[in-house]
Design a protein with these regions (language model features):
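Alpha-helical transmembrane segments in inner-membrane proteins
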Residues: 2-236
Length: 236
């Protein structure tokens, strides 16, 4: 007996493997949710005031939700780039988009705080413009890397080009910080952007993160079959 006599065997094996992966993913997702909920109740002290405790729980819930969305965006972006460029080593940090996004966000903050004197359009704050700078910086950095990489170049050449520009953008970011170091407030904001923080996350930041992350993940979810085909390569 072989697979040719029973063509359904490979299909059933593939279905079983998908079920196993789905089960593992389900358990991991459940573990993440349970861990996030338990983290809300872990702390160094106990708040006796019920109103203050409710307020504190609300703050921690917003921060946990924003951190969850940020982690989902980082993991999804890595998988998407691995599929698009057909290389398991591809990632936003290697291709330069992470450094480009950081530089774009920092330039936006410098323009708002130094050039415009923190003058943002009515109804909008500086923090609302930071994601715009990050998105523009990441897109421009990726476009530059793709334009400077030969059309028929190997994926390794693309990764090397991205790594070079990632170092260049990181150097420009360090130069920008050194130029504005006399303003300790702006320097603190730039360092917070570089290192990442959810300390100031609230309902508005959560809504903004949800729109950006879910809006980007929806097309990726709809094109998951195409990404799988790209990741499989020409031989398979």
């Amino acid at each position: 007996m072989n697979a040719a006599d029973h063509p359904e065997l490979p299909l059933s094996a593939a279905a079983t493997e998908r079920q196993r992966l789905a089960l593992r993913f389900g358990w991991l997702a459940l573990a993440v949710v349970v861990s996030a909920l338990l983290s809300l109740y872990v702390g160094r002290g106990d708040l006796a005031d019920a109103a203050l405790g409710a307020r504190f729980m609300s703050l921690r819930a917003h921060r946990s939700a924003v951190a969850f969305l940020a982690g989902a965006a980082l993991s999804a972006s890595g998988v998407i780039m691995q599929g698009l460029f057909r290389n398991p080593l591809a990632s936003p940090s290697i291709l330069g988009t992470t450094a480009g996004a950081q530089l774009g966000g920092e330039l936006m903050l410098v323009v708002l705080y130094v050039v415009l004197g923190n003058l943002a359009p009515a109804g909008l704050s500086a923090e609302m413009f930071t994601p715009i700078g990050c998105v523009l910086g990441s897109l421009l950095s990726l476009i530059v890397v793709l334009l400077l990489t030969p059309l028929r170049a190997s994926p390794v050449s693309l990764l090397l080009t991205g790594f070079l520009f990632s170092s260049l953008f990181a150097s420009l970011s360090a130069l920008l910080k050194s130029l504005v170091q006399e303003s300790w407030q702006l320097t603190r904001v730039l360092n917070t952007l570089s290192l990442g923080s959810v300390s100031g996350a609230g309902p508005r930041q959560l809504a903004l993160a949800a729109v950006l992350v879910l809006g980007a993940l929806l097309p990726a979810w709809l094109w998951w079959r195409e990404l799988d085909v790209l990741m499989s390569g020409e031989e398979e």
